[in-house]
Structure formats: structure tokens, C-alpha cells
């Protein structure tokens, strides 16, 4: 019996281990929920072991610090033709860096993940399993003498019929299509809130790229980003996208704060100690040095020239233009007597939103690369209070505001819900975000308008192409209004591009892009405008295809005016009284539109570089000669937090700052031309509180 017992013990242990494995594997394979990730699920794709540390930080480190989930996928083995030993050393380096970011011991669980039937090495941080590193390990030598040659990844991406195989255990061979399918499956499996990748926009052919040449990147960086963006098309979802400038960031100004640079440098050092091309170990290591020292001081984002500017009336018949900088990644305003742009700071990778506060002053919103929303308010003397965070929510896209300038906004959160926010006073303070009723499959491009009864109505489309609306309910005394459940709008399938406004008959007009044709389509509110159930006219196809969002406004009589861009670098169209007219102007971005003292303004980015904006204006039926705004600054960006206003400082912050804003207005001597001048102090007026019937 003792002998039998002794023989059974190993078998028992084996069975126990097998059972434990069966129990644990599904849990290990299942992606974490949004709740487990504290609302943040980052999925970063990079070519090499260190690209994320040099080009995507401090963003990744910030999300780990916030308790978010971070999964990084390294496409190549990063072996430089030196074999597994060098690859494994670099892998140890990134693990050390991520353990440091997570404030946990450098202890990892190693196993193999799968995507699209492919086996991929996977490491999970034991002290914080929200952090995972996946290694596809595509072989990565130069296929020639070095720069000016292809790599296996860039060759497979650019040449038909090529393949790339992997280094180390679990060998795999990929075609270009198989790489895209695998990346798409990784996106679908994880369900990210943000997909991060490198710069796909560099147009220099792979075989003409050179080390540290201006504007040049690495062929693997470019190839990886192009493959990821194609994978995103195959795996759409409610997630944000952020692309990162890599090598060329060294050509731009430092835009990280000193504390960010210090932290980013130490993180990179933990990697460099394990990469013998950088350091032999911690002792005597002087990294980051050389170009790495420049990269750790910067974080810049890919811009695609398709971001519409924002327009704001200055209160005296002039127009102020705001734009996100493609070079400085900051919020910018067209400036003064010097006729140039100046920066309002911040780091943003997307568009801006402008609106009007109840006291007649301008407001701005911007989205940071972590999904946070920041607001800024202008004073009557033209200075700005400073950026304040609209905390409690991370959003996939910039919020949408009502088109007549009201300071209220709706945005799609990382949680898949639409959320509402409005000012809580006239001093620049805001309420907390309010959850709207759930809408399955909601997309990130809602529209909002104010109905005839004074209450707001929000429109949203779903991934299935359906249109819905929700309206504010009457508010109890001292309470903010709630919203009724979403109701279907009878309409053809939509592909986004929503815009809504109240017209001269106090009826809401709704516009959207029709799925299939991409035509601008119009619906007009019918029936009793006080009824919570909104009736609609038959959909009218206006026959104009367009991209992005329509710019929408109304003249003094309430007649609705829209402007759209038919395609990238295509013609602008103006829609008045339901009739589209093609303008003699082309643009790279969708337009912005405003009507100020009878003058219609349309502003859009021109094609090509550098970043410039064309200002079209029409008064009394006559178009003025177009004005071009150029010279958007290359510097001035930085973290919003260092520019943020404390609530107690809001009335006084920056009150002695110089007024740098410039106004575009019709010339007093020649109405057929536009003048550019310094923005005067705004006319003060009593605040007009929102009235709700």
C-alpha cells in the first residue's frame, strides 16, 4: 500500500495540474473587461522593441499609472540579423521597462497567445496582469547593406507575393494579407478603447529612406502602421486611433514637461540596460543619448490634413479662426497685427470645438491623446482663463456641440455610452458628465440641436446604420433634465456625418450621409414640435457626396446653410434652401462655416504643405477675394495640465496676458476684400440663462 500510495502521488499531482490548467486557460485567454481595466484598454502596435518607449510615452505610462490595461504588440523580432540572443535581450528590456512603469517586480508569466490561428509569444506581468506584451517575432535583418534596403516586413508590405517568417519557437510564415488578418483579429479579441500605431504617412519610398534625414522614418515603422490601419478597417469598433511621429519628432521642439522627460528617460534606461547596442548594463549607462535623448523629450502625433478648423464671431463683425497644429500638436489661434498664428498650448491629436458661453464669450474644447476633454474660456478682454479638465470621462472623439454656438456638448465615452455636459455657471465652470440612455452600437459622431421648446435633442447613428434621437425631459426644480429613451428616426441607412439645427420655422433639420451613395440627405421635423415623439418628412437626397461632417449654421432669418467637402482635395459645396452649389474652391479638410453680421464665411485647410487655411466670404451675394492664413506655429505645445486653470483662479488667470488673437472681417474701404486685424476687447453683455419650457 505505501508503494501504491507513492506511485499515485505523481499521478495525482499531474491530474491536479491538468485540471488547474484547464480551469486557468480560459481565464487567461479571455481579454479583460472594461471594468477590470478601469475604463482604459490601450492596444499599441509597434515595429521594434523600444519604439513604444521612445515615441508613445508618456501616453502609455500614463494609462498604466491610471490603472488601465495596456497590451503592446511587437511585430518584428528586432534582431537586426543577430539572432535569438539579441532578440531575447531586447525582450527582457521591454519587460523591465513595463515592470518599472507598473511599479511591480520584473516577474512575468510566459505563454503563447493565438490570433487568426497564429501562435504569438505572450508575457503577462504577474504583479499587474493588466499589462501584456505580445511578440510576433518577424525576422528583422536588412535585406541589403542597411539603410536604402528593404527589411522582411517592409518587403512583404510593399511587394506582391512576398512572405515573412518568424524567429524562435512557434514558427509562422505570413503573407501581407495574413498579417492584416492577424492584426485585425488581435483588435477584435481585445476590444480596445484606443489603438496606437506609428506614422504611416511618410511618402518616401522604403529604398530611399536614410538615417536621420529630415522627414525620414524607418521602413518597418511605416510598414507596421500601414498594416495596422488596414487591419482597423477590417475590425471597426468603438475605439480611438492615435498615430505617433517617430524619428522625425527630433526635428520638432521639445513639448514634454521636465517631469515627463525625466520619467520617460528612466523608463527607457530600464530597457537600454538589456540592449547591448545601448549599454552593457546599469553601470556606466548614459542612455538616453544621441537621438534617443531627443526622442524622450518629445511626443508628437500623426495629422492627416483632414481636420476642420473652428470659427468664432468676435462680437464686432469679425471672425476668429482656431485650428489644431499639425506640427506643434497644440491648439492655435490666428493672430494679430503680426498676421500670424499663436498657440494656446496643450497636446492634442484631433480637432477642436468652439462655442459661445452665456455671457457672449468664446469657449473651446480639445481632446488629449488619452481621451480626456479640456475646456478653455475667453474673457471679455480677449485673454483666456486656461485649460480645465472636464474630468470623469474619456471619449473616443471630440464632443459635438449645438450649431448655434450654445455651450453644451455630447460625446461617446470609452464605455460605449453617450454623455452630456453643460456649463454650471458663467465663470467657465462645468457640470459633471451625465450618462444618456444606452444605445447599442452607438457611433462617435452624434449631433445636437435645440428644439422649439428650448430643450435639447441629440441624434446618434449606430454601426448598423440606424438613426435615433433622445430629448430632454422637463426638469424638476433644482435638478438638471433627464433624457427619454432613444427613439428610431425613419430614414435610409446612414454612414455618419450627422448635423442638426433649428430652422426659421422652429423645426429641427437633420442631415446625414446616406450609406452606399455617401450623399447628403435631409430630414425635416414635421407635425407638433412640442410632441416628445418627433415626426419627420420624407428623406430628401440632395445628390452631393461628402466626407467628414457638414458645417451647418443659420442666417438671421433662420434659413439653414451648410457647407461640405465632396472628397479629400475635392470641391467645396454650399447648400442653401435645400439646393447645393459647387464652389470654385478645393480643400483638404471639411469646412467650417459661420454667418456674422450678414457675411457668410467658409474656411477650410488647403491641400499639401505647409498647413494653411483658405477663407472664403460672401456679402450681399458677392464673393470677396479669398484670404489665405498661413504660418501655423511649429512650437507652443505642451501638456494641458501645466496650462490648466484652478477653479479659484478662473476669474483672474492670465488677466495681464497679451491679446494675440486676430480677426478676419470685410474691409471698411472695399467690401470685396477681407482685412486681418487685432481682436478688440469684446462687448460685454448680461448673461442669458438657458430657458426650458
Task: Spell out what each predicted region is.
Residues 1-16:
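Bacterial N-terminal signal peptides that target proteins for export
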Residues 14-26:
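Bacterial N-terminal signal peptides
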Residues 30-189, 261, 270:
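Active-site rim/loop-helix segments in enzyme catalytic domains that contact anionic ligands
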Residues 60-67, 73, 188, 233-234, ...:
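Short, surface-exposed basic-aromatic patches at helix termini and helix-loop junctions that form
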Residues 81-89, 204-219:
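Short, flexible/disordered intra-domain loops and linkers
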Residues 169, 190, 194, 214-217, ...:
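The feature marks non-catalytic terminal segments
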Residues 179, 183-205:
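Proline-aspartate-enriched helix->loop->beta-strand connector
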Residues 302-693:
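A structural motif
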Amino acid at each position: 500500500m505505501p508503494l501504491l500510495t507513492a506511485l499515485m502521488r505523481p499521478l495525482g499531482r499531474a491530474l491536479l495540474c491538468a485540471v488547474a490548467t484547464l480551469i486557468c486557460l480560459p481565464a487567461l485567454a479571455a481579454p479583460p473587461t472594461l471594468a477590470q481595466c478601469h475604463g482604459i484598454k490601450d492596444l499599441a502596435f509597434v515595429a521594434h522593441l523600444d519604439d513604444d518607449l521612445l515615441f508613445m510615452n508618456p501616453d502609455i505610462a500614463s494609462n498604466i499609472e491610471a490603472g488601465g490595461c495596456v497590451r503592446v504588440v511587437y511585430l518584428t523580432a528586432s534582431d537586426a540579423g543577430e539572432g535569438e540572443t539579441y532578440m531575447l535581450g531586447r525582450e527582457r528590456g521591454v519587460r523591465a521597462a513595463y515592470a518599472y512603469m507598473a511599479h511591480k517586480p520584473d516577474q512575468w508569466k510566459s505563454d503563447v497567445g493565438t490570433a487568426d490561428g497564429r501562435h504569438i509569444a505572450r508575457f503577462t506581468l504577474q504583479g499587474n496582469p493588466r499589462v501584456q506584451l505580445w511578440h510576433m517575432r518577424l525576422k528583422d535583418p536588412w535585406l541589403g547593406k542597411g539603410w536604402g534596403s528593404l527589411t522582411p516586413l517592409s518587403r512583404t508590405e510593399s511587394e506582391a507575393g512576398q512572405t515573412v517568417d518568424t524567429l524562435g519557437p512557434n514558427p509562422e510564415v505570413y503573407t501581407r494579407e495574413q498579417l492584416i488578418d492577424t492584426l485585425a483579429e488581435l483588435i477584435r479579441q481585445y476590444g480596445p478603447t484606443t489603438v496606437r500605431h506609428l506614422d504611416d504617412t511618410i511618402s518616401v519610398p522604403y529604398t530611399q529612406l536614410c538615417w536621420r534625414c529630415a522627414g525620414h522614418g524607418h521602413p518597418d515603422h511605416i510598414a507596421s502602421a500601414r498594416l495596422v490601419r488596414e487591419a482597423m478597417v477590417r475590425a471597426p469598433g468603438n475605439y480611438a486611433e492615435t498615430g505617433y511621429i517617430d524619428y522625425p519628432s527630433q526635428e520638432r521642439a521639445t513639448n514634454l514637461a521636465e517631469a515627463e522627460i525625466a520619467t520617460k528617460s528612466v523608463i527607457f534606461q530600464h530597457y537600454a540596460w538589456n540592449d547591448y547596442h545601448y549599454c552593457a548594463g546599469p553601470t556606466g549607462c548614459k542612455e538616453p543619448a544621441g537621438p534617443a535623448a531627443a526622442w524622450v523629450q518629445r511626443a508628437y502625433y500623426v495629422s492627416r490634413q483632414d481636420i476642420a478648423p473652428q470659427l468664432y464671431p468676435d462680437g464686432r463683425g469679425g471672425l476668429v479662426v482656431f485650428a489644431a497644429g499639425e506640427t506643434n500638436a497644440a491648439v492655435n489661434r490666428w493672430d494679430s497685427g503680426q498676421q500670424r498664428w499663436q498657440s494656446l498650448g496643450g497636446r492634442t491629436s484631433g480637432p477642436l470645438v468652439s462655442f459661445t458661453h452665456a455671457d457672449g464669450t468664446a469657449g473651446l474644447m480639445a481632446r488629449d491623446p488619452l481621451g480626456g476633454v479640456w475646456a478653455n474660456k475667453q474673457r471679455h478682454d480677449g485673454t483666456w482663463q486656461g485649460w480645465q479638465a472636464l474630468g470623469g470621462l474619456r471619449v473616443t472623439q471630440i464632443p459635438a456641440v449645438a450649431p448655434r454656438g450654445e455651450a453644451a456638448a455630447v460625446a461617446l465615452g470609452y464605455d460605449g455610452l453617450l454623455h452630456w455636459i453643460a456649463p454650471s455657471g458663467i465663470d467657465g465652470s462645468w457640470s459633471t458628465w451625465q450618462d444618456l440612455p444606452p444605445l447599442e452600437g452607438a457611433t462617435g459622431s452624434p449631433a445636437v440641436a435645440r428644439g422649439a421648446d428650448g430643450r435639447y435633442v441629440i441624434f446618434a447613428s449606430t454601426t448598423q446604420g440606424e438613426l435615433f434621437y433622445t430629448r430632454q425631459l422637463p426638469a424638476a426644480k433644482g435638478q438638471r433634465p433627464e433624457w427619454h429613451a432613444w427613439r428610431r428616426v425613419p430614414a435610409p441607412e446612414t454612414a455618419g456625418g450627422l448635423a442638426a439645427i433649428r430652422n426659421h420655422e422652429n423645426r429641427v433639420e437633420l442631415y446625414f450621409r446616406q450609406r452606399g451613395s455617401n450623399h447628403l440627405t435631409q430630414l425635416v421635423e414635421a407635425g407638433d414640435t412640442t410632441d416628445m415623439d418627433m415626426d419627420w418628412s420624407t428623406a430628401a437626397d440632395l445628390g452631393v457626396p461628402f466626407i467628414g461632417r457638414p458645417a451647418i449654421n443659420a442666417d438671421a432669418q433662420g434659413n439653414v446653410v451648410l457647407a461640405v467637402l465632396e472628397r479629400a482635395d475635392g470641391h467645396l459645396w454650399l447648400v442653401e434652401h435645400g439646393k447645393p452649389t459647387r464652389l470654385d474652391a478645393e480643400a483638404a479638410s471639411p469646412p467650417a462655416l459661420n454667418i456674422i453680421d450678414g457675411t457668410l464665411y467658409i474656411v477650410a485647410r488647403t491641400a499639401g504643405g505647409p498647413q494653411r487655411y483658405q477663407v472664403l466670404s460672401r456679402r450681399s451675394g458677392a464673393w470677396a477675394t479669398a484670404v489665405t492664413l498661413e504660418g501655423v506655429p511649429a512650437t507652443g505645445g505642451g501638456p494641458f495640465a501645466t496650462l490648466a486653470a484652478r477653479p479659484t483662479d478662473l476669474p483672474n488667470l492670465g488677466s495681464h496676458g497679451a491679446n494675440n488673437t486676430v480677426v478676419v472681417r470685410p474691409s471698411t474701404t472695399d467690401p470685396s476684400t477681407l482685412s486681418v486685424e487685432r481682436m478688440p476687447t469684446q462687448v460685454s453683455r448680461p448673461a442669458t440663462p438657458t430657458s426650458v419650457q
